Amino acid sequence: MVEFLILSFTLIPFVLILIQPDLGSSLIILFIGLIIIFLNGLNIYKIISGIIVLLAAIPYAWFYVLKDYQKSRVLNLFDPFSNPLESGYHSIQSSIAIGSGGLLGKASEYGTQTDLLFLPETHTDFIFAVLAENYGFLGNLIYFVIAFLLLSRLIKITLDLHLHSNRLLAVTYVIIFIVCFLINIAMVSGLFPIVGIPLPLTSYGGSSLFIYLIIFGLINALHNRKTLIAN
């Protein structure tokens, strides 16, 4: 019953966002929903059956569902220089920005990719490339340490929850944060197709920041409720 409810609440936004069309965001929502169902204790045979169905659907989706620009994004993941001025442009400029940052970055100099506007969407989807060019490897390392500390705290709070429903809810929020964080970093680094996923708590955008603040507030509320019950 729980799996059915989770799947229902996953498929509704998946279909609506897919119709927009926004294939990347819809697939991420579906992926997060499937992870939650798996963590809720879905039968292993059902999991294997679902994986087989998804794998079998890939050829059909490639030839009959995906549009040309969506296919080009996937192909450019392997060879962005095949179309350097169109679909591969973002990946190339982002990789150059990350690589040119070096160890300490160019914050005291002039960032070629960001300041000269070669890199698009510098304040939203590709903000990590801007950080890499301006503050280099050391700046990225500090950024990852801060993100790791935040994530560690979220996971600790989640594991401390006793009620299964509360823990499942908190796990959902943590997975949303992890998936969006990793996909954005992989996308900017050229390890994932370009999708419109902002970097949590870093990319410019009121709605994105507002949602993550709500998520952290709900996790904190679950933690406080557990503490009150214990006392």
What do these predicted regions represent?
Residues 182-231:
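A juxtamembrane structural motif centered on a specific transmembrane helix
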Residues 98, 102-138, 165:
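Long extracytoplasmic/lumenal interhelical loops at the membrane interface
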